[in-house]
Amino acid sequence: MRAWKKCREHRAFLIGALVIACFYLWRIQYGNAEVDEAFYLTVPFRILKGDRLLTDEWHVTQLTGFLQTPMMLLQRLLFGGTEGVVLHFRAFWLAGHLAVMTLSYALLAQRNRVGAVAASWVYGLSVPFGLMSPGYYTMGVASVYLLAVLFYGRRDSRAADLLKGVLLAVLVLCNPYCLAVYAGLLLLAGINGFKHFDEQLEAVHVARWHLGIAVLFLPFVFHVLTGTQSLSCLLENIRNIFLDSAHDSSGFSDRIFYSLRMMLHENRVFLLRFAVLFLAGLCIRRIRPLMLGMIALLCAYDALRDARYFIYVWDGNSLTLFLLFGAAAALIYCGQRAYEMLTYGLALPVLYMLTLCLSSNQGLRAMLVGTIPCACMGVMFFAEYVKAHPMSIALGGRRVSCLGIMLALALAAQLGAQGYVRAKQVFWEYLEPQALTARM
């Protein structure tokens, strides 16, 4: 406790978390609960009424209802029905959101406290589609982010391994296509069995992951099997779910490449500017700190632009896209801890980002959700670079980091853009910003 009182980074985190908590305590009281947010709540409600997943539901994202059922049960126990259910679920989301902020900060702070503070703030103001409710987007992003933090920090204790397993189970329940993430980690573990490059991928740790997975997987299997008529019927239902006509029926690669092409086309001016700055820093080593600072400012500028002019086009999901490219630049420039940065800080969230194209009918807008963990880890990469490559000037008798100042300005602009969008945007209410004038 004394360490928390003495450390200015700890105090900065607490102040930021308090501000974000107060902001959302105000914000969750406003905005309509239409379309997705209200629909999410029908699944756990029906489960409590006796329906079974994969038998009585048709959509790809239904498995999230299994995670929401305890919350709906608590709602019914405390209030006897569904009165106030939307507001109460938003409160559940806020509690979980703050918990993820705190846990991620505590884990990252042991690597870089300044980076941990900045990453926690970026995560705190990032909400997929502005949907402040426990759903397959919000819980999926939280799971991927914590997985990235745990692996990036090389956490391999029993508790960390069990938590990794639970998070993998949550991730797959939020998005079944995230079995690709699980398969990717198993592939890495298999390669590690021959090369021995990562201790946290050793067999004993992988076995503990599966104990964590079983915590959710076994109750889920019991729930599904007690409601199905036969195994063949269950398999047929699963097949029909993946052929859901409400979602794009084209091939997996077609959906992914279409979204990628659209992303590149919509941001071609940003990408051109980024390429010039990045290549300049790559070719001339001594100006890399300056170029990285300018890249961070460029990312923040485009986030501010999207917040001002495209708030109802991308639902605020694009604000963290630009930091994905900033993260890649910091990773390449840094050269230290490249394996952890690339594999867990960047590749893991990017793989999740691609799976969102397959599970959602929102295309690029859904894909952009996956850039939230990338952005948070990217901020951490920036901090790691500053620590390893300080670029300072004399100011008032003290050495001041020029790159640090540039990154601080970029962070302030990034947080300002995200705060503005979170305060103004209401999901699916493109023409009715007055929805924020009425309480829930």
Where do the model's predicted regions map?
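Transmembrane-helix motifs of polytopic, lipid-linked glycan transferases
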Residues: 91-113
